[in-house]
């Protein structure tokens, strides 16, 4: 039996053959040429894809952007997620993703992990007939341009329901620690792809904090990047302030067009580990580490100012580990001295750092989340958003 262009996908209790088709529209090409000199035009028609069923209303979270085809969403940042609700016993997930690890959850319980699923349809069958919530989440960091989520579909006869909604929003800006790189690992010395394979962004301090407050979130975080200086001075002059402007981490010319619906009440910044982990290298623009520290503090204060312009009513949480806590404390002090009142400083202490390459492990992430949650709770009126609304379609302001 030939299975050209098809694959057996097992999700739930049923396996089916599918043909990878990302667009449902019928494609018809008309070729106006003569057959054997007769002058009769020939119509060439590509076979229509099978009926995909009913497209569900989707709640897209994380830094995901609408795709070229209605119903599609493109994503590249870790933690991006898509949610929908329906009444029935079956649902299909349309994807084109060759880089990500993704988790499929039904009613809050993980049903399937998809590692680099490629292009096609993941079919879920055999659910108990009734109302369900499906969630698809990117749980790792990947290094391609972007992937595409093509929607959730249910068969005819099932009932679409309104997508989940939330009223709270938190934005996290950071590095590999923020996205939870290798947090599942139980050892510091890792080999090959282990550091990526042992990652689950759902268990990062960012996702844990958002879950505690039942908040939507964006995780804008990249490994080896710093606020002003990347690990060992790599990829200069780009730094996390540069990448923050992007719709996808590795697409330099695609600026993130921020939707009016995204106006986080809390912004958590966790940048400094890569800035200070390794001493200055030849060719870097600072005379010594003292000069770099001063530049880091200046740049951090300016970055908060840029973010404040986007979210006038947001509450900022600045976090640090031992290696750069004094510098972030100085940022916090300067912001307060300038009249900034909606800001907190959180110093992470007592971390075991037992995951790959001394990254925080799952226990550390739980502790870090608890510290951030305590700071937010202590602020009192964080969720009472103030200030002017964000302009529809606004972009992230560039650094000077």
Model-predicted segments: where are they?
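Conserved beta-strand scaffold positions in the cores of enzyme catalytic domains, especially
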Residues: 172, 217-219, 345-347
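N-terminal secretory targeting modules
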Residues: 8, 13, 31-32, 39-201, ...
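A structural signal for isolated positions on well-ordered beta-strands in alpha/beta enzyme cores
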Residues: 135, 171, 218, 315-317
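N-terminal secretory signal peptides that target proteins for export/translocation
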Residues: 1-22
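Conserved SGNH/GDSL esterase-like catalytic core that processes O-acyl groups on lipids
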Residues: 77-80, 119, 142-146, 188-289, ...
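Sec-dependent signal peptide recognition
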Residues: 23-30
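Alpha-helical cap/lid subdomain in secreted, periplasmic
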Residues: 107, 241-386
């Amino acid at each position: 039996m030939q299975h050209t262009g098809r694959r057996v996908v097992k999700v739930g209790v049923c396996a089916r053959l599918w043909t990878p088709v990302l667009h449902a529209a019928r494609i018809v090409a008309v070729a106006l040429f003569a057959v054997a000199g007769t002058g009769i035009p020939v119509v060439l028609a590509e076979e229509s894809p099978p009926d995909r069923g009913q497209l569900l209303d989707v709640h897209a979270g994380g830094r995901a952007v609408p795709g070229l085809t209605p119903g599609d969403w493109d994503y590249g940042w870790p933690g991006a997620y898509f949610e929908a609700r329906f009444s029935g016993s079956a649902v299909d997930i349309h994807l084109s993703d060759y880089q990500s690890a993704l988790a499929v959850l039904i009613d809050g319980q993980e049903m399937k992990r998809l590692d680099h699923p490629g292009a096609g349809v993941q079919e879920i069958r055999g659910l108990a007939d009734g109302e369900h919530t499906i969630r698809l989440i990117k749980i790792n960091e990947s290094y391609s341009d972007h992937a595409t989520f093509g929607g959730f579909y249910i068969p005819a006869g099932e009932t679409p329901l309104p997508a989940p909604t939330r009223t709270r929003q938190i934005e996290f800006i950071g590095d590999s620690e923020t996205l939870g790189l290798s947090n599942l690992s139980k050892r510091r010395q890792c080999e090959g792809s282990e550091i990526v394979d042992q990652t689950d962004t759902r268990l990062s301090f960012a996702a844990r904090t958002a879950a505690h407050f039942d908040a939507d979130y964006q995780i804008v975080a990249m490994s080896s990047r710093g606020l002003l200086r990347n690990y060992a001075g790599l990829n200069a002059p780009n730094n996390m302030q540069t990448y923050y402007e992007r719709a996808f981490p590795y697409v330099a010319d695609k600026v993130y067009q921020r939707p009016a619906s995204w106006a986080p009440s809390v912004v958590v910044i966790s940048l400094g580990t890569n800035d200070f982990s390794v001493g200055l290298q030849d060719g870097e623009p600072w005379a010594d580490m003292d000069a770099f520290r001063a530049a880091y503090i200046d740049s951090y204060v300016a970055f908060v100012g840029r973010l404040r312009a986007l979210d006038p009513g947001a509450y900022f949480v600045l976090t640090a580990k031992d290696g750069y806590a004094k510098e972030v404390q100085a940022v916090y002090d300067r912001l307060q001295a300038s009249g900034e009142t909606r800001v907190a400083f959180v110093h992470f202490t007592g971390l075991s750092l037992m995951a790959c390459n001394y990254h925080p492990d799952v226990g550390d992430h739980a502790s870090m989340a608890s510290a951030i949650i305590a700071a937010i709770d202590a602020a009192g009126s964080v969720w009472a958003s103030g200030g002017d609304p964000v302009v529809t379609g606004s972009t992230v302001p560039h650094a000077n």
